[in-house]
Amino acid sequence: MSLESVSISTSKYITTVKANIDGHDYIVRKMGAGTQLDMSREISNLMKMRTELLNLEGKIKKAKTDEEADKMLADNMGKMESFNKIVNRIEAIFIDLFDDGEDGKRSAKLIHALGIENTQKVYNEIFDKAEQNAKE
């Protein structure tokens, strides 16, 4: 039995768009199902953690003693660390989607400057415009 050799390109399964953002070209990759699932999970975790932090903030204001407030503040710091880790994971997903053609530092700087919500808006705008251009 002979072993046949095959070569396959995945480019037809992955959508990318060249986008000029603030004077620099990026190749932006559309999220696949796995990336969408990761993003959805992280956004859900972020919203849950945000709710917990807001609830804890209210409890701290109602604390009866300084010791009680200090304990809650310490718990709050741990939750803030968790919140920041989730934000970092979401940003990492976006950084991976925005290829700056270099070492990724420009992509990271862009994502950090925009924040998650505005990065999502830019991402959506890129693919909305690409879809409109394809129809024309």
Region roles according to the model:
Residues 2-20:
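Short acidic, Pro/Gly- and aromatic-enriched capping/linker segments at domain boundaries
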Residues 3, 14, 24, 31-136:
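Short, surface-exposed, charged amphipathic helix/loop patches that serve as local interaction elements
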